[in-house]
Design a protein with these regions (language model features):
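Pocket-lining segment of extracytoplasmic ligand-binding domains
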Residues: 2, 11-13, 42, 79, ...
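Structural recognition of the beta-strand scaffold that forms the well-ordered cores
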Residues: 25, 35-37, 56-57, 103-107, ...
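Short gly/ser/thr-rich secondary-structure transition/capping motifs
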Residues: 17-19, 37-39, 151
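Extracytoplasmic
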Residues: 20-23, 31-33, 52, 121-124, ...
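Short, solvent-exposed loop/turn elements at domain surfaces
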Residues: 6, 34-36, 136
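Acidic, polar ligand-binding/catalytic clefts
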Residues: 1-30, 112
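Bilobed "Venus flytrap"/periplasmic-binding protein-like clamshell domains
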Residues: 28-98, 194, 210, 214, ...
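An extracytoplasmic/periplasmic, membrane-proximal ligand-sensing/linker region
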Residues: 87, 91, 97-98, 108-126, ...
Length: 236
């Protein structure tokens, strides 16, 4: 949802490129959870505690880096307030195992393999992103939504952790025929598809009609909009 919004508007990681104005949404699918992982020995219990710490914000040009900057800003922090590193999550996790990294951001579905592996070898804390600061983020950037990582998702994390997420979304072009996209949307939300989604990957169970429009920051394709109005998801 974040990348689609940036591409459509020519902002974020897309600010030096022409906007892709024909992008249209079919559906929000499942949450890509924002993980702020900290070493348990780092003393980091909140985003505020990142000040002065060694923090990986992901690679330059990545969506995660832009998301991390937005979150830091909501807490009154910038990259200059932390000892910023720009590493892939697996590299940041390796540094943390070696005692050379205090925290890192990761955006992806849970359980994330790199974090699960790290948690099995090193005591970690999953830092909450919540309260007024999270409300500021979701209020200013419609592609963010509240999310919760359940207790026990990662070894040593024994309580639910409230955080934010961006959506994995099904995107198409405004050039695609209305009737075709209508039928695709209708097929996604029929009973047979529901059975397949529930029987497959864990993320499939999170693909629901109730959340089909969550965090959608670009226009719906007219075919998808037609279906959602018929289904009562969108009002007149």
């Amino acid at each position: 949802s974040d990348v689609a919004t940036w591409a459509h508007s020519g902002t974020g990681i897309w600010e030096e490129r022409d906007p892709v104005e024909k992008l249209r949404a079919i559906a929000n699918l499942y949450p890509e959870t924002i993980h702020l992982v900290a070493s348990a020995s780092s003393g980091i219990d909140s985003v505020d505690d990142l000040a002065g710490k060694r923090v990986s914000l992901d690679e330059p040009g990545s969506g995660t880096l832009v998301d991390a900057r937005i979150i830091l800003d909501a807490y009154g922090l910038t990259e200059k307030d932390v000892e910023a590193h720009y590493l892939k999550p697996d590299q940041a996790a390796e540094r943390m195992r070696d005692g050379a990294m205090d925290a890192f951001f990761f955006v992806g579905g849970f359980p994330a393999g790199a974090i699960a592996e790290l948690a099995s070898q090193h005591d970690i804390t999953l830092v909450s992103i919540s309260g007024d600061e999270a409300a500021k983020v979701t209020g200013e950037h419609g592609f963010f939504a509240a999310n919760t990582v359940p207790a026990g998702t990662y070894e040593g994390v024994g309580e639910d952790v409230t955080t934010l997420s961006v959506g994995a979304q099904w995107i198409t072009s405004a050039d695609q025929p209305e009737e075709m996209v209508y039928e695709i949307t209708k097929a996604l939300w029929n009973d047979n598809s529901r059975k397949l989604l529930d029987a497959g990957h864990l993320k499939g169970r999170q693909i629901t009609l109730d959340t089909a429009l969550d965090g959608v920051g670009i226009p719906l394709h007219p075919g998808a909009e037609k279906f959602y109005r018929e289904a009562g998801v969108l009002g007149d």
